[in-house]
Amino acid sequence: MAELLNVKPTRMELLNLKRRIKLAKKGHKLLKDKQDALIMEFFTIYDEALSLREELGRKMEEAFKALQMAEIDVGMLRLKEISLSVEPNKEVDIKKRNVMGVSVPLIEAESFRRSTSERGYAFVSSSPRVDLAAEKFEEVLDLAVRLAEVEETLKRLAREIEVTKRRVNALEYIIIPRMEATVKFIKQRLDEMERENFFRLKRVKALIEARS
């Protein structure tokens, strides 16, 4: 049996508890609906994360192969010089957006992909293979930024799902059962008190009749 609440067994408390149970059940339904919606959203984004991870893995493999070919073409020393001469890319701006009531990151950044002239190294000291390697790594950066946003969103959704689940379970298995058990107890106690009053009045009536 669920633990009873520490309240007086009165009709006022009975009415109050019935109202609280009604509100608790309404809150439980809303939280359960929220939990279900969060889980659906989580798995939708999870599928996107899996796809991005697979694509990122492929792109990184392509990028490192292209880098090896560029190194063969111009040599490691020259490749390092070229990398140091590259102009810094655009800044990444991290904002927030709302997903099912959860604040998640929104990474705003223009594509990292640039033309050869925008990268800042000299044409004469480079080669098509260096350009290809740079292009491949720029593709990797684009995917990595998107994946970072998606994975952080997943983490925050997972935390919110866990918090919501605890609230749902608390209402379902502790709070509502305690209130319902207390309502049952108060009803029984009021019935007992009513019977006691009835028999008390009956005895009083019998005594009065016996004296008259």
UniProtKB/Swiss-Prot annotation:
Q: Which GO terms describe its molecular function?
A: ATP binding; proton-transporting ATP synthase activity, rotational mechanism; proton-transporting ATPase activity, rotational mechanism
Sorted alphabetically, which Gene3D superfamilies does this protein's record hold? 1.10.287.3240
List the cysteine pairs that form cystine: none
Which key words tag this protein in UniProt? Answer: ATP synthesis, Cell membrane, Hydrogen ion transport, Ion transport, Membrane, Transport
- Where is it mainly found? membrane
Role played: Component of the A-type ATP synthase that produces ATP from ADP in the presence of a proton gradient across the membrane.
For this chain, the family text in UniProt reads: Belongs to the V-ATPase D subunit family.
Tell me the protein's name.
Answer: A-type ATP synthase subunit D
- Gene (name only): atpD
